[in-house]
Structures are given as C-alpha cells and as structure tokens.
Amino acid sequence: MSQSPIELKGSSFTLSVVHLHDSRPEVIRQALQEKVDQAPAFLKNAPVVINVATLPNGANWKDLQQAVTSAGLRIVGISGCQDERQKRAIARAGLPLLSEGKGQKLAPEPVISPPENVPTQTRIINTPVRSGQQIYARNCDLIVISSVSAGAELIADGNIHIYGMMRGRALAGASGDAKCQIFCTHLGAELVSIAGQYWLSDQIPLEYFGQAARLYLQDNTLTIQPLN
C-alpha cells in the first residue's frame, strides 16, 4: 500500500501577538515600523497574531490590515474579536479568527514523579554562533560557551546560559515555561524572551548593556538584575 501524500500532525509554534490599542491605521503602521527597524532580523516578515480586543467596534479592518502588512509583518490570525461586523470583514480578508474561549475541562492526568538522580539533559555549544544560525534546545537547557553574533538565534524550552558576548536573540521557555531564565556574561542582545514575554534591544536598560545579567519573569513581566 502506497504512503499517503500528506500527513496532518499537531504542533505548536511561538508567535508574537500584536495588541492594537489605536484604530488609526497610520499610527499603527508607524509604531510597527519603528519596532521592525529596531530588530529587522527578528521581525521583518515575521508571522504575527493580531489581537483586536481593545479596538472600537466599526474600526476599518481593511486599512488596519494594510497598515500591519506595510510594516513588514505577516498576519497569520486574528484574536480577541467580538464584533460581528468586524468578524465578517476579517473573514472576507481571508484571515482565520483564533478562538480564545474556554474549552471543555478535562480530568487532569495523573502526575508521574520522575526517577531520582536522573540528570537533566543540557545542550552545550562550544563554538561561536554565527549570524543566520539558529540553535534550538528542545526540552532542555542551552549553554553557549562562546560569542553569539547579531542575527543569530538561541531557542530553548529550558534556561539559556551564554558565556560570551551575546549580540543575537535569546528565547528561553519557548514551550511556555515561565520559570525559565536567561543568564549572560556580556549582554548586548537584539532580543530577549522568556515564555513569550520579550524585550527588544531598546527596552533593555542601558546600564546592563555589555554587563553580566540575569533575566527572569516576575508577575509575568520581564525583570533583569546583575549576575554576580
């Protein structure tokens, strides 16, 4: 029997969500363009979800869609839409509406305690990470014992440790673990992210640039402190 030409599988991806708080298309376009210009390697042509929960009913979706795409972002879905007329306009644009409603509650699966004295897997990179490279540590921590160039990307489901100059992007807790942290001996990143909460380079406090720093989430907000 021949193999099927296609196969459908469930998967998950880390996507940025753009929350629109203003219905003026030009204001939105300019604000997004500034963000894209700050981190073009990360945001140019990036897939995003647009959250329209705070937009007034009757906002011109066609113009807002054009404003977002003109800034260089690629819309993959819309969330937070409650207005029926807006929903119809979004559907006519050929974009999917993403539901954020509460699903049916399932009985929790029994928790199985992991065996004791089993070491946690860690991915270790001993060489420089060049521009354009992406390193992904699935279900584990990532340690880089070298420099990370601008345009390079580190992704880990666990913590990220960089023992060198960090000029690229670091995304810890990629699977959603808000307890993950980023440790860096020389911070100069284009972007840092933990469980989807991120800072672009201009949001990192200036006094920490080039310094040893630890980043973590506190009350779902990125927090930074010196790494002693």
Curated annotation (Swiss-Prot):
Disulfide bonds: none annotated. Signal peptide: none annotated. It comes from the Bacteria. Keywords: Cell cycle, Cell division, Septation. GO terms for biological process: cell morphogenesis; division septum assembly; regulation of cell division; regulation of cell septum assembly. InterPro entries: CAP/MinC_C, MinC, MinC_C_sf, MinC_N, Septum_form_inhib_MinC_C. The keyword Cell cycle applies. NCBIfam families: minC. Cell division inhibitor that blocks the formation of polar Z ring septums. Rapidly oscillates between the poles of the cell to destabilize FtsZ filaments that have formed before they mature into polar Z rings. Prevents FtsZ polymerization. Belongs to the MinC family. Interacts with MinD and FtsZ. This is Septum site-determining protein MinC.
